[in-house]
């Protein structure tokens, strides 16, 4: 395909088409990959799929973060700080809170009756439904069970072991919100590139850096995930010079494979920009059904898959083999996921876009596709980071 006139300033390739791509499909694949990954521990099966130093779910996390890094940076650089934060909160929090309520009010009672024969004592148990919802409202998961359920399952005491990662996703949103305040970051790609390299260095030297945070788990997890997110951000700030082309895409994916193979401890994070560029290229030629292009249910798949899998395990479906367990869980998870998208996520985002139209005060890094409406990014943004490994233990 030839270049359009808007591609004249690019050193290589063509501008990324923010409207005609399969990023929704790719994110849906990542969400389902997390469901598949969780099938092993939730069924009590050992030796879940892993390669290059991480699990299948862990690599799905990486994919989510790099795509999110690209799209969220676009959102930040094309919106005022206030509108940006409103968009991010609207995209993440309502569906998150409703998921907490659904688990506490629908899934947990079923689990309690299954374990005790009735609902007697359910509302007064050690971890009440209200406590579960209220304790986790701030995105930081601190309570995983409801009234001691789920019980009598291979992975007991955890209704939703995926939601913990949303906290770290939102931390990345706040980091981009902060660095976007500086005019130099908007005008030149180099500051954000340097910030990405510093995040990689922190990940490489985690053993030396961690003691200064007293081996804080949240700090270590953020340091591990941030390079993936910033890798996507780096690809965004260089898009006015480096377009999408098959040759650098193949080289990027090869470099990512080499880094992760030879340096499994930190090669994935160091490959953040390579992975992001490769995924953007794939999204331009991978065919996607129109229904998926227009409807993004990957967030719903992510937040509801784990409780659906736990509910199935309560009734012994995990004992019929991994294939049946995975397929049934995937089909059933689409029900709450689609409902969440149609009834909650899409209406809220449409309402937010109608009310928030304030542009960023400082022009973003100029590029041949700088005229793409900011809403295009938000229509593709899913603040999801389906978790990888290890699964969180109940507090």
Where are these regions (language model features)?
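Structural signal for the C-terminal ends of transmembrane alpha-helices
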Residues: 72-79, 105-111, 178-187, 233-242, ...
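Alpha-helical transmembrane segments of multi-pass integral membrane proteins
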Residues: 254-346
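Functionally critical transmembrane alpha-helices in membrane proteins and complexes, commonly lining
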Residues: 18-76, 93-95, 301-306
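Interfacial loop-to-helix transition and helix-capping segments at the boundaries
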Residues: 20-22, 49-61, 155-168, 208-228, ...
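C-terminal "closing" transmembrane helix and its immediate cytosolic amphipathic cap
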Residues: 1-14, 77, 106, 262, ...
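Solvent-exposed interhelical
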Residues: 170-199, 236-247, 318
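Juxtamembrane transmembrane-helix termini
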Residues: 2, 7-9, 60-90, 95-120, ...
């Amino acid at each position: 395909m030839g270049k359009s006139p808007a591609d004249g300033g690019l050193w290589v390739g063509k501008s990324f088409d923010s409207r005609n791509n399969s990023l929704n499909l790719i994110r849906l694949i990542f969400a389902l990959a997390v469901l598949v990954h969780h099938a092993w521990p939730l069924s009590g099966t050992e030796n879940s799929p892993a390669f290059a130093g991480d699990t299948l779910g862990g690599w799905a996390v990486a994919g989510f973060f790099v795509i999110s890094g690209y799209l969220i940076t676009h959102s930040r650089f094309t919106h005022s700080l206030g509108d940006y934060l409103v968009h991010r909160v609207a995209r993440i929090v309502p569906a998150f809170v409703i998921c907490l309520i659904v688990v506490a009010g629908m899934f947990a009672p079923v689990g309690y009756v299954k374990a005790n024969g009735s609902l007697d004592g359910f509302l007064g148990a050690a971890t009440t439904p209200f406590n579960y919802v209220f304790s986790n409202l701030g995105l930081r998961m601190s309570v995983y069970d409801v009234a001691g359920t789920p019980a009598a399952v291979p992975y007991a005491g955890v209704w939703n072991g995926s939601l913990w990662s949303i906290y770290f996703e939102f931390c990345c949103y706040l980091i981009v919100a902060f660095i976007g305040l500086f005019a130099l970051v908007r005008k030149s790609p180099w500051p954000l590139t340097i910030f990405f390299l510093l995040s990689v260095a922190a990940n490489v030297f985690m053993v030396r850096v961690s003691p200064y945070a007293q081996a804080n788990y949240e700090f270590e997890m953020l340091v591990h995930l941030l390079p993936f997110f910033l890798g996507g951000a780096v690809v965004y700030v260089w898009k006015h010079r480096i377009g999408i082309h098959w040759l650098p895409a193949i080289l990027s994916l090869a470099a990512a494979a080499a880094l992760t193979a030879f340096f499994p401890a930190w090669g994935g994070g160091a490959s953040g920009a390579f992975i992001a560029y490769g995924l953007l290229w794939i999204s331009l030629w991978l065919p996607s059904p129109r229904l998926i292009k227009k409807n993004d249910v990957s967030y719903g798949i992510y937040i509801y898959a784990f409780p659906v899998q736990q509910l199935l395990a309560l009734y012994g479906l995990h004992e019929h083999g991994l294939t049946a367990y995975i397929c049934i869980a995937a089909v059933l998870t689409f029900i709450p996921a689609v409902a969440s998208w149609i009834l909650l996520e899409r209406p809220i985002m449409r309402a937010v876009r109608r009310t928030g139209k304030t542009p960023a005060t400082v022009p973003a890094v100029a590029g041949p596709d700088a005229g793409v409406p900011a809403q295009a990014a938000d229509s593709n943004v899913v603040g999801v980071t389906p978790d990888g490994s290890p699964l969180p233990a109940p507090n």
